[in-house]
A protein has these predicted regions:
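C-terminal lobe and adjacent flexible extensions of AdoMet/dcAdoMet transferase-like proteins
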Residues: 186, 203-257
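Catalytic cores of RNA-modifying enzymes
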Residues: 1-205, 243-250, 257
Length: 257
C-alpha cells in the first residue's frame, strides 16, 4: 500500500527506531494510556499492542484503518477513524490524561502541537516525529535563529528535547529532509492573570516582523507611551525569553484594565 501525499504520509520502516520510540513513551508514566496519531501501517502500533498498555490510535486514512484491522489483533474502539484535529480529546479516554505519540503527518505536525497546547491539562507528555526544521523551531532557545512564535507558545506549556535524529532512509517513501523525534514534557502554564488570547496575539505580532524592535511592532497595542521606554521594547523578538513575553503581556494588559 502506497503512501498518500494528501495525508502527508511517510511510513517509518526502521524497526529498531520504532521500538525505541515506543519504549520511550512507555517509560514516561506506567499508569497513563497512549494515544497514537497517524499509525499508518502500524510500525509503532504493534509495539503498543505487545506492551499491554492501554492505547488508542487516530487515523484519517480509511484505507489504513482497514489495513491495521486486517493485520493486527486490535479490539473494537481502539482505532478512531477521524481527523485528529477534530477529535474531542477529552472523550478519548473518558477524561483521563494520556501520552501523545506518533510519526506525525508532516503536513499537520505544527497543528498537532498547537492542539496539544490547547489540551495541555490532558497531555503531560508528547513524543513525536517531525521534520527536523519544525522540531528545531518547537524547542529552540531564545536568541537562536530558529526561535519563533511556535517556540514561545509551546514553551509556555512544555519543555522539550530531541531524543532521536532520523535520516530519510528510515522512511518509505523517504522525505527530502531530515527528521527528529522530540520529547515534550508539560510544565507550568501561563499565570492565571495572563489572558491566553492576548499572549498569543502579542507573540505572533512580535514575530510577524522579527527584524524590527518590539516598540515598533507592538506599538498598536500600547496606550501609555511611557511603556515603550521599557527595556523589553528596545529588543527584537528573538531576544526575549518566554518569561519576558509573559511580562510583556502583563504590562500590556495592565494599561488596558
Amino acid at each position: 500500500m502506497r503512501a498518500k501525499k494528501s495525508y502527508g504520509q511517510h511510513f517509518l520502516i526502521n524497526e529498531s527506531l520504532a521500538g525505541s520510540i515506543v519504549k520511550k513513551a512507555l517509560a514516561v508514566d506506567p499508569d497513563l494510556p497512549i494515544l497514537e496519531v497517524g499509525p499508518g501501517k502500524g510500525v509503532l502500533t504493534k509495539y503498543l499492542i505487545e506492551s499491554g498498555r492501554e492505547w488508542k490510535a487516530v487515523e484519517a486514512d480509511r484505507d489504513m484503518i482497514a489495513y491495521l484491522s486486517n493485520n493486527y489483533d486490535i479490539a473494537e474502539g481502539q482505532l478512531i477513524s477521524a481527523d485528529f484535529l477534530k477529535v474531542k480529546l477529552e472523550e478519548v479516554f473518558n477524561g483521563k490524561p494520556f501520552i501523545l505519540l506518533g510519526n506525525f503527518p508532516y503536513n499537520i505536525s505544527s497543528q498537532i502541537i498547537f492542539r496539544a497546547m490547547k489540551y495541555q491539562d490532558l497531555i503531560p507528555s508528547v513524543i513525536g516525529m517531525f521534520q527536523k526544521e519544525v522540531a528545531d523551531r518547537i524547542i529552540a532557545p531564545h536568541g537562536s535563529k530558529t526561535y519563533g512564535a511556535i517556540s514561545v507558545l509551546n514553551q509556555v506549556y512544555y519543555t522539550g528535547k530531541t531524543i532521536f535524529k532520523v535520516s530519510p532512509g528510515s522512511f518509505n517513501p523517504p522525505p527530502k529532509v531530515q527528521s527528529s523525534v522530540i520529547h515534550l514534557t508539560r510544565q507550568l502554564s501561563l499565570p492565571e492573570s495572563v489572558k491566553l488570547s492576548t499572549f498569543r496575539t502579542v507573540v505572533k505580532s512580535a514575530f510577524g516582523q522579527r527584524r524590527k524592535m518590539l516598540r515598533n511592532t507592538l506599538k498598536p497595542f500600547i496606550k501609555e507611551t511611557s511603556l515603550l521606554e521599557s527595556g523589553l521594547f528596545s529588543k527584537r523578538p528573538e531576544q526575549l525569553s518566554v518569561q519576558d513575553y509573559i511580562q510583556l503581556t502583563i504590562d500590556i494588559q495592565n494599561q488596558i484594565e
